[in-house]
């Protein structure tokens, strides 16, 4: 599934095509895995990293499980795949996506990144800090989601991004694009949701109590008590 990097000369070393998908993963579920595997195939990625956020400034803290539990659920869901679930944002000390991406680009110069988001996040993108700078850092792939696609195209973000949209049939060539560059991906809809899982099992995170985790990127151990009380 490795993508081909077209360089201008033999001295240009191929960088590893890597997707970045951020989120709370509260918890991670089969829908996350399905869209990620589809994106890996469509974009010819070597790997896709799940950036499990310590905390989303745009989401309420109520109902948010502790990071160790969310990361454990993500690592479990990513097994036997090119997906790597990481809590590297906690180690980087970043709160906003733009700061995380800047640090990842500097830390991993041998990787060529593409930011992956759902169409629902594209609707919210103008609320993100320095959102235009995110688009200037790396290409963006937007995954269509039922109920969001028409609104996503009409929102303020697309007023600026529309000029940078690339044809979907050229998606596998994203490593040749100079950002800003945006491509829309359409896969079979997946109705699974973290909200439904939490409603069916509000204490889902307790099954990860006491598990010690090693982050696949930082190699640091991440562990901590899983709160027994209200989340």
Question: Which residues does each PLM region occupy?
Answer:
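Nucleotidyltransferase catalytic core that binds NTPs
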Residues: 1-231
């Amino acid at each position: 599934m490795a993508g081909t990097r077209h360089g201008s000369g033999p001295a240009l070393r191929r960088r590893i095509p890597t997707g970045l998908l951020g989120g709370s993963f509260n918890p991670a579920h089969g829908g996350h895995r399905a869209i990620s595997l589809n994106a890996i195939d469509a974009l010819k990625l070597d790997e896709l990293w799940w950036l499990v956020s310590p905390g989303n400034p745009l989401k309420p803290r109520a109902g948010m499980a502790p990071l160790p539990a969310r990361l454990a659920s993500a690592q479990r869901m990513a097994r036997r795949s090119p997906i790597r679930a990481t809590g590297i944002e906690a180690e980087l000390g970043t709160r906003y996506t733009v700061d995380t991406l800047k640090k990842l680009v500097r830390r991993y110069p041998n990787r060529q990144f593409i930011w992956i988001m759902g169409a629902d996040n594209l609707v919210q993108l103008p609320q993100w800090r320095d959102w235009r700078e995110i688009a200037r850092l790396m290409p963006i792939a937007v995954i269509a989601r039922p109920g969001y696609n028409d609104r996503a195209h009409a929102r303020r973000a697309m007023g600026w991004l529309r000029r940078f949209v690339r044809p979907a049939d050229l998606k596998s060539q994203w490593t040749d694009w100079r950002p800003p560059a945006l491509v829309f991906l359409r896969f079979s809809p997946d109705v699974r949701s973290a909200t439904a899982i939490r409603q069916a099992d509000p204490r889902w995170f307790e099954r990860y109590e006491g598990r010690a985790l090693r982050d696949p990127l930082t190699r640091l151990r991440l562990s901590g008590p899983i709160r027994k009380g209200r989340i």
